[in-house]
Amino acid sequence: MTLFHLILVAVIQGLTEFLPVSSSGHLILLPELSGMADQGQVIDVAVHVGTLFAVVLYFRADVAVAVAGVGRLIRGRIDTPGAFLALCLLIATVPVMVVGLALNLTGLDQALRSMAVIGWTMLIFGIVLYWADQRGPVTRKAGAWTLRHAAIMGLWQALALIPGTSRSGITITGARLLGYGREDAAKLSMLMSIPTILASGGLLGVEVAAQADWALLKDAAIGAVFAFGAALLALTLMMRLLRTVSFTPYVIYRVCLGTILLIIAYS
């Protein structure tokens, strides 16, 4: 794997992981459209670790609160904001893990990795995001997250297992429909990404650990660093822009890309 290819994969993953445009969809399309070899699972795990560190750093105050509450949650007590937040995140993560395991066992996860599927999900869920963003009420703050809303957003998140859907895009869609403002919807979506990336990356990491050699580990470290930088930049810019700008620019991008992919897929 060349350094250019490695950096390209890391930057694409970093820039698209938290924007509502689907990082997995872009990474699947990269080898198909460019002719480059697939980056492999070790690099996949590495760039996800990089983006994980980025979101943890950006929302470090909220993460610290949740981590502080984990101990109380384990003891069956949810009498602090941290324990409640940790429980909400746990509940929101269960659906995607269950559905992800089912797709993996049946082989459907690989069957869905096609340009046509990505084109349709880019287009359809982009339009759904626009509809939710324009019509969704603004009646709640992230601090008023409930267990019921965490479960509902978790069900939305499970749809992100279809390539091209976008984990952040679909959870933001769900949050907007539940009444959360743009910044608060994005914040909840980003916090939900932490246990999801931890769980999926941890399982995949165990699978690929035996495959890695020192040269590959060096590439993985480089990929993680570049993914971290790109993700932190994208996350910072998006959260700032959401104070004054809607999700429409991302929707336009999704619709345009989805349309192009469908034309290519069916031509």
UniProtKB/Swiss-Prot annotation:
Lineage, highest ranks first: Bacteria, Pseudomonadati, Pseudomonadota, Alphaproteobacteria, Rhodobacterales
TM region positions: 1-21, 49-69, 83-103, 111-131, 190-210, 219-239, 245-265
One protein family per Pfam: BacA
More details: Bacitracin is thought to be involved in the inhibition of peptidoglycan synthesis by sequestering undecaprenyl diphosphate, thereby reducing the pool of lipid carrier available.
Membrane topology: Multi-pass membrane protein
Gene Ontology cellular-component annotations: plasma membrane
Family: Belongs to the UppP family.
Native species: Dinoroseobacter shibae (strain DSM 16493 / NCIMB 14021 / DFL 12)
Keyword Transmembrane attributed: yes
A single GO BP: response to antibiotic
Protein name per UniProt: Undecaprenyl-diphosphatase
Record's subcellular location: Cell inner membrane
Molecular functions per Gene Ontology: undecaprenyl-diphosphatase activity
Function: Catalyzes the dephosphorylation of undecaprenyl diphosphate (UPP). Confers resistance to bacitracin.
Keyword Cell membrane recorded: yes
Keywords per UniProt: Antibiotic resistance, Cell inner membrane, Cell membrane, Cell shape, Cell wall biogenesis/degradation, Hydrolase, Membrane, Peptidoglycan synthesis, Transmembrane, Transmembrane helix
Substrates-to-products reaction catalysed: di-trans,octa-cis-undecaprenyl diphosphate + H2O = di-trans,octa-cis-undecaprenyl phosphate + phosphate + H(+)
Enzyme Commission number(s) of this protein: 3.6.1.27
